[in-house]
Amino acid sequence: MTLTETSLSHNAEEGKDEGGRLQQYKNLTKHEELRRRRTECSVEIRKQKGADMMMKRRNIVDVDEGGNSESELEEPEKISHQQSSTRLSNDEIRAILSNNPSEDDMVRCFESLRKSLSKTKNPPIDEVIHCGLLQALVQALSVENERVQYEAAWALTNIVSGSTEQTIAAVEAGVTIPLIHLSVHQSAQISEQALWAVANIAGDSSQLRDYVIKCHGVEALMHLMEKVDQLGDSHVRTIAWAFSNMCRHKNPHAPLEVLRVLSKGLVKLVQHTDRQVRQDACWAVSYLTDGPDEQIELARESGVLPHVVAFFKEAENLVAPALRTLGNVATGNDSLTQAVIDLGSLDEILPLMEKTRSSSIVKECCWLVSNIIAGTQKQIQAVLDANLLPVLINVLKSGDHKCQFEASWALSNLAQGGTNRQVVAMLEDNVVPALCQALLQTNTDMLNNTLETLYTLMLTVQNGYPHKVDILHDQVEENGGLDSLERLQESQSEQIYTQAYRIITQFFTDDDAGEKESHENADPQDNKWSF
């Protein structure tokens, strides 16, 4: 059985266990809904990080000018102080390596191979694989010559930065274990380059990540963490990025005990002086918390979350993973949601939303707040006390459509879970114009949220605050809400039609009470004439 077949079989069993665990949640509906939306929301925020957090990275060098690589590896004079000018073809490399090559011959061959694989466009990865040079590269990793090892590790880094098929070909050729061994090499340059390749393998898929774990990749990472203070920034960036790839993939997640070990290393990385290290480490924490409660709990137990909240005051490339992390934590049980509040995160949201120009940051802020509002009434009150309700209403009214969508969820969660007093706070903060404007949207989920919020608000006012009924009705009519409700009765969506019909018949008919009750009890799809 191949590596791929074995891993896929194992993952299928893990998926069954994951489904079983979901049924153990105290509030299953809340968890399933929030986690579904967490998956949907993750795409936009990941666009923001762009190339900074690609699953794979190539070590590219200008092969025509012989410049330095992207990685800016340390101590280049110790290993790469010579640059051969002659480029060898794959056939020439095969011929030299097949004829009892000297170490100088090997250096020349693997340097040439590395240069060809470092081309910015269309590196010849398939050609190298098909001509049988993968095995030569694997063997080179064990040659007692640091220059040979380094050039081979660099070439392999770029091979495993390719497609899944190319990466699997390298793994099945046996690259993983020797690369992991070299990742703890005494030479920092070799160590970093080998770890870079290992991180590319782990970043490909959950199957290959699990294979790296099986080959003791986590132990190698934690060994490096023991001396992280002695390593250069470039090396630590590679370590942090490797952590993120080890935490990244789902279906299945990495084993809980592995994530527990990694979480301890992340505490140190998020406090590093280098911003790129902190950024990659925080993305790793966001992946760690993108799972069931026991996984989120690891982040809380490790002590990493207070450092994540502190990122709210830093540059937006740190704010983005911090918001994603805390939003993930808030999808957990009420205790985990409370942990987000206790960290003081709500106090940071308002100034963050006021100063940012990024719609992605605003959207993530709304998503985080909506997850907290989906908690207890005490937690809803914490959001109101932080003066975030007017901000949500303003986003619903004037934000871009993705931000409006998240704000509509937040207000819908408030309407469904808040006390009467908390629900009426929306009216006092002038929510009606924003709701009426949202009724003009075409997104079905957003319309459903808005109609549900408006209905609950009107019902709450009618039952508990009768002196505000006329004010509320007038505001709905003056802002075009009644016209929109009448139009939505023609919607192709049965749910939207039913909700619009319910609001009109219950709150905007002038018939006597008996006739009103008759309408309420009638099937909204029953259009028969009655006399």
Swiss-Prot record:
Cell compartment(s), UniProt: Cytoplasm; Nucleus; Nucleus envelope
Annotated source species: Caenorhabditis elegans
Protein keywords: Cytoplasm, Meiosis, Nucleus, Protein transport, Repeat, Transport
Entry's transmembrane regions: none
The ARM repeat ranges on this chain: 122-161, 164-203, 250-290, 293-331, 334-374, 377-416, 420-459
Phenotype when the gene is knocked out: Embryonic lethality associated with a terminal aneuploid phenotype: embryos display severe defects in nuclear envelope formation, accumulating nucleoporins and lamin in the cytoplasm. Worms lacking both akir-1 and ima-2 show reduced gonad size and aberrant diakinesis oocyte formation; defects are caused by impaired meiotic recombination.
Domain IBB: 5-67
Biased composition (Polar residues): 1-10
GO cellular component, one term: nucleoplasm
UniProt-listed SUPFAM superfamilies: ARM repeat
UniProt tissue specificity: Germline tissues. Expressed exclusively in germ line cells from the early embryonic through adult stages.
Family: Belongs to the importin alpha family.
Biased composition (Acidic residues): 62-75
Biological processes, Gene Ontology terms: embryo development ending in birth or egg hatching; meiotic cell cycle; meiotic sister chromatid cohesion; mitotic nuclear membrane reassembly; NLS-bearing protein import into nucleus; protein import into nucleus; regulation of chromosome segregation
Source species, domain of life: Eukaryota
Entry function: Nuclear transport receptor that mediates nuclear import of proteins, and which is involved in sister chromatid cohesion. Binds specifically and directly to substrates containing either a simple or bipartite nuclear localization signals (NLS) motif. Promotes docking of import substrates to the nuclear envelope. Together with akir-1 adapter, required for the import and load of cohesin complex proteins in meiotic nuclei.
Molecular-function GO terms, alphabetical: nuclear import signal receptor activity; nuclear localization sequence binding
Regions of compositional bias (Basic and acidic residues) in chain numbering: 11-20, 29-50, 515-531
Stretch list, region Disordered: 1-88, 511-531
Main localisation: cytoplasm
Keyword Nucleus appears in the UniProt entry: yes
Subunit comment: Forms a complex with an importin beta subunit. Interacts with akir-1.
Stated name of the protein: Importin subunit alpha-2
